[in-house]
Every structure is written in C-alpha cells, then in structure tokens.
UniProtKB/Swiss-Prot annotation:
It is found in: Plastid, Chloroplast. It comes from Cestrum elegans (Red cestrum). The keyword tRNA processing applies. Belongs to the intron maturase 2 family. MatK subfamily. The gene is matK. GO terms for cellular component: chloroplast. Signal peptide: none annotated. The lineage of its organism: Eukaryota, Viridiplantae, Streptophyta, Embryophyta, Tracheophyta. It comes from the Eukaryota. This is Maturase K.
Length: 510
C-alpha cells in the first residue's frame, strides 16, 4: 500500500518555493514574449503613457488592483487621472497570465532536464523531438489496430470546479503565495473573460491566454494519466497470475485457490486460463482512445471503471455518454483530420492437394485512412474559397495582391493539404480539393483583372497555374526524386511525413 501511495504522488523532487518573487522580475515578461507567447501589443498601445515595455512598477500596481473587490469603484476614480492605470482587465490579465504561465513552467522544465540527464547517465538517450510529429501516431495505429477488436472513444472530462485546476499544481509548486494568486486569478476571470467554458465537450480557451490555460489543462491531464497508467500497469501485471474464468473478479485470489483445490482432487482437468489483453492508449485534442483485443464485456468494465475513476479521484461529473464502445471493423472515427477505420480486405487463395483443388476465402484486416471531404469543403467554404456545396469562388480579400503572391498563397495551401493527407489510402478526394483551389485561384486573378477565367487564362497562358499541376510531385520530392518514372506507383501509396507538428486552420489564413 505504501508503494501505491508513493506512485500516486509522481516524482515531484523539483519543488521550488520561490516562484512568487519572479512575478515582479521584468526579464520574466521579456522571456515570455521571446518564447512566442504572442502578447497582444495592440491592447498595450491603446493605453497612453505606455512605452511598449513592461515595468516593475506597472506589474506591482496591476497585481495590487486584482485584490480590491469593487473594481468599478476603482475604475471610476482612477481612470480620469491616469488612463493607463484605469480598470483594463484585458490588459493586466493578459500581462500577468502570460508571465505567470512562464513561471509555472519552470518546475516542469527543470524536471524534464533532470530526467533527461538521468537517462544520459544510464546510457538511455531519449530524444523527445523525434516524437513531436502528429503523423508519428499513425504508423503505430497501422501496426496495432489491425489486430484489435474494440475501441473506447473517450472525451476527457473538464474539471467542474476551479479548485481542481489549482490542486493539480499543489504538489509541484509549494509556494503558497503563487497558489493563492493562481486561485484568485482563476476565480476572478472565470465569468468575465470566459476562460474555460463547457459549451462543448473538452475545453474552449481564450486566444489571449491560450498558453496559460493549456498549461493548466495539460497538468490536469498529466495528473489523470499518471494515476491511470499506474492502475493499468497493476492490472496488466496481474495477468501473469493464472485464474479461472470468473465473471466476477472480486476476491478472485481466494476463489482461485478453492477452484484449483477442487479441480485437482475431483476432476483432474486442465483449467482454461485467460489473460487480460494489453490496452493501447492514445490521446489527442481533448480526446483519448483505449483499444484492446478483448471482448465487449471487458471494454464495458473499463468504461464504468473510468467513469468511477474520474468521479471519485477528481470529483468531476463524468457521464457514461462521453465514452463510446465501438467495434473497429464496423465503425470509423475522426482522428487527427482523417477518417480512420479497420476494414476487411477479402482475398481468395486457390490450393491443390494431389488431385483435389479448392478455394479458400481469407479476410485480412487493414487499417484504412480516408480524407474527410465534407469537413474539408466546410473549411474551404469558411475561408471563402468555395460555397458550402463545393463550388469554387473568388477570394476578394486577396485581389489587391500581385499575381505571383496570389498564386503562391493558393499553391502553398494546396501543397500543405497534399503533404498532410499523403498518408491517405485513397487520394481521389485530394484532387477534388485541388480542383477547387485551382479554379478559385483563377477566379481571383480574373476578378483582379476584371475578366473571365477563360479569357484571363487564354491571355496569360495555362502555365500560369502550373504551381498546382506539380504540387503533389513537389511534396513527394522531399523523399523521392520526381525524375524517376519507376516510382510512379509510390505516389499512390501512403507516406507519413514526420515533420508535421500541427494542423493550421484555413479560415485563419489571411
């Protein structure tokens, strides 16, 4: 039991008690800005008297103004005297949250450095940057999912109480002042800025405070997974112990002793033994997958176990409807922009023994990945490249650009789509997307020159849109040479590129 208690509190040896004074250091905010936190400078520039640099005096005053209860009274009294020091919640919440997130990451960064140094001493070099790609998950799924039967699709629950977010850090950060500021900050801006809203499953983050709340969310998920992985390992190790086929696993140690004694004396028969199959776990975008080769009964037990686990251990209201049991051969799922499924690939083998010949029907499971055409067209329609039905339209906001810039932007989007969906088993959908972007580019150029698409291409030449004709080949040339005609079949095969770290929203590409 003591071993379990030690494991339930992960290795938090890097506990620092002096994080709160770092909030008043100017270099913290400079480092936070340099690390790509994208502090909204437009908010700061709207305040007269501010010289685009964070000041220690400003930070102290902003923290002081977080504690009075009547913010409206402070605003009405101070805003006329000093416009900058008036009540601007978006200003100081933005400044402090970004700097505070950077400070809270220090214990985790130090632990990562210490763990990597220990692995180097043990001659077990671990390079985390090799595991950063989104596509690194798909080869794992190809190797394992074709041999599995059921999968649990889980929506990770969000904490219903703000205190849960603060408590996830209480073992890492022993600084009471920092935790107090964190609690006050969360409660103060929960309703004012809609930092985390349960409008849909998962989390909805404020764009201005994305890093801060992604950090809190990841620490919460880490706490969930650290406990869950330990309990799963305990269950996994139990499978080496032989036990009878009992529907109830409660007190099975005592039952197996009785069964073995009875069977050995009376029946002298060999017991049918079974083992818990290994569980494969994948987490992505607020969701997680538990896949196994076990039966529906086993997956149903894991479903109710997870519900009780989150409700009891994290006091989170978790509904059974957030976990779905699906059979891999009969269900496809939206996984990282792909429609993934395991389909049966039938094949027929002719066999002959002496004078007798017969046919054998064989079905091989194959992990299939398809391009979701409807969501892609929806993204293109949202970005004004086509209608909701997939009819290409011009992009008016790009009409003021030069012809080369317009073609370059359309070509860049097309190449990125071909690059990301190169792992698809069927690429016909990509050519439809390519057609939409190509015709949208032509209509944008025709709109700029006040002409029709046919007249513009006839006057400028069809080679003007050659960017789209070679988009796929240019992407694949990162690995294979385009000049080799013998590799034509390679372009039709799936290729997982390990340099893709994120999915860019086309609607935000302006």
């Amino acid at each position: 039991m003591e071993e379990i208690q030690r494991y339930l509190q992960p290795d938090r040896s890097q506990q620092h008690n002096f994080l709160y004074p770092l909030i008043f250091q100017e270099y913290i905010y400079a480092l936070a800005h340099d690390h790509g936190l994208n502090i909204n400078r437009s908010i700061l520039l709207e305040n007269p008297g501010y010289n685009n640099q964070l000041s220690l005096l400003i930070v102290k005053r902003l923290i002081t103004r977080m504690y009075p209860q009547n913010h409206f009274f402070i605003c009405t009294n101070d805003s006329n005297q000093n416009p900058f020091l008036g009540c601007n919640k978006s200003l100081y919440s933005q400044m402090i949250s970004e700097g505070f997130a950077f400070i809270l990451e220090i214990p985790f960064s130090l632990q990562l450095i210490s763990s990597s140094s220990l692995s180097l001493e043990g001659k077990n070099v671990f390079k985390s940057h090799n595991l950063r790609s989104i596509h690194s998950t798909f080869p794992f799924l190809e190797d394992n999912f074709s041999h599995l039967n059921y999968v649990l699709d889980i929506l990770i629950p969000y904490p219903v109480h703000l205190e849960i977010l603060x408590q996830t850090l209480r073992y890492w950060v022993k600084d009471a002042s920092s935790l107090h500021l964190l609690r006050f900050f969360l409660h103060e801006y929960w309703n004012l800025n809609s930092l985390i809203t349960p409008k849909k499953p998962g989390y909805s983050f404020s764009k201005k405070k994305k890093r801060f709340f992604f950090f809190l969310y990841n620490s919460y998920v880490y706490e969930c997974e650290s406990t869950f992985v330990f309990l799963r390992n305990q269950s996994y190790h139990l499978r080496s112990t032989s036990f009878g086929a009992l529907l109830e696993r409660i007190y099975f140690y005592g039952k197996i002793e009785c069964l073995v004694e009875v069977f050995a004396k009376d029946f002298q028969x060999t017991l049918w033994l079974f083992k818990d199959p290994x569980m494969h776990y994948v987490r992505y975008q607020g969701k997680s997958i538990l896949a196994s080769k076990g039966t529906f009964l086993l997956m149903n037990k894991w479903k109710f176990y997870l519900v009780n686990f989150w409700q009891c251990h994290f006091s989170x209201c978790f509904e059974t409807g957030r976990i779905h049991i699906n059979q891999l051969s009969n269900h496809s799922r939206d996984f990282l922009g792909y429609l993934s499924s395991v389909r049966l690939n039938p094949s027929m083998v002719r066999s002959q023994i002496l004078e007798n010949s017969f046919l054998i029907n064989n079905a091989i499971k194959k992990f299939d990945t398809l391009v979701p055409i409807i969501p892609l067209i929806g993204s293109l329609a949202k970005a004004n490249f086509c209608t909701v039905l997939g009819h290409p339209i011009s992009k008016p906001v790009w009409s003021d650009l030069s012809d080369s810039d317009i073609i370059d932007r359309f070509g860049r989007i097309c190449r990125k789509l071909f690059h990301y969906y190169s792992g698809s088993s069927k690429k016909k959908t990509l050519y439809r997307i390519k057609y939409i972007l190509r015709l949208s580019c032509g209509r944008t150029l025709a709109r700029k020159h006040k002409s029709t698409v046919r007249a513009f291409l006839k006057r400028s030449g069809s080679e003007l849109l050659e960017e789209f004709l070679t988009s796929e080949e240019q992407v694949l040339s990162l690995t294979f040479r385009r000049a080799s005609s013998s590799l034509w079949g390679v372009y039709r095969n799936r290729i997982w590129y390990l340099d893709i770290f994120s999915i860019n929203d086309l609607a935000n590409y302006q």
